[in-house]
């Protein structure tokens, strides 16, 4: 949730920074006005309660002394109670209105994020490995899949519909091997493996920032409070929702492999062939919870962890720093890793590593204490793909294809495929 103290402290600077993230200035004026109203109502409520409590004490004395002012004082207390009821109702409604607005405002970009409008303004940080120069015309992964019977596209459509995949034969074994390889790499790097439900409740999606803004991107279970999770970021971030952690327990590192479900609203006509954009896909996720002063250092190490998998598989990739206009809703800073796909003759996103600062922690109420007597502070949360399995599968198949259409595998995967 957006930190309202930023608006209270300097609404002009806040507007300027958030304009870079495409948030209208009018929204902040609306929030500022509501916040002033809410705080005034709270002050009125506090003053009236103090007056009521004082009069209640006087009533006892007046009654004991049979003072003629007793009835007048009782009437005044009843009047205050009635006024308090009205103020309390108004305050509750206005507080709900304010919270709903705060829930749809994205996180503020960090000052280190390049300013820009869209993906064209993202900044390339580095490239690792040169794309392979084929001495033949390389096939796309969907053609290689058909040639080698790695995917049954027809049965996928028959059983479910478009944007779903059935991997078969060597294709299925490679898919499983990549999942295990990514998990093993993450666990060896110190991440605690979690096996989580793929159905999550509304509170979890609010905590991660997916709701209420991105409801159209989700699959909701009918007549329930449940949704199919769009990413294990939701489950892993919410492991400590409504908890106060010990500072000595931080940082916490988690990794999980889960199927992910997305409606892909608004993506009609994009990446219609192959496995790049599916309604259901698998992803190995990383999540970190840490102290605020450590979060940007943790972002660098998280990104390096995802990069280490691509390097172990010897896949050409590049790291991109997202500009303000391309940042995700919950993110203060994001690096994208893009792997080279010959079929596109371009780099395609395979990982997104983000520092969400205290944005998700405020929504999910994830706090920590330095000592028992110390005040609570919000943790910082980070998340990253390590990696998106279907896109990784496509990258391996395309980059390791041979002239006869066969596919070799990276040395790092040899012990995983049998």
UniProtKB/Swiss-Prot annotation:
PROSITE patterns membership: AA_TRNA_LIGASE_II
Binding residue positions for L-serine: 231-233, 285, 385
Catalytic reaction equation(s): tRNA(Ser) + L-serine + ATP = L-seryl-tRNA(Ser) + AMP + diphosphate + H(+); tRNA(Sec) + L-serine + ATP = L-seryl-tRNA(Sec) + AMP + diphosphate + H(+)
EC numbers, comma separated: 6.1.1.11
Cellular component GO terms, alphabetical: cytoplasm
Keywords: Aminoacyl-tRNA synthetase, ATP-binding, Cytoplasm, Ligase, Nucleotide-binding, Protein biosynthesis
GO molecular-function terms, A-Z: ATP binding; serine-tRNA ligase activity
Any one Gene Ontology BP term: seryl-tRNA aminoacylation
UniProt comment concerning the protein's domains: Consists of two distinct domains, a catalytic core and a N-terminal extension that is involved in tRNA binding.
Record protein name field: Serine--tRNA ligase
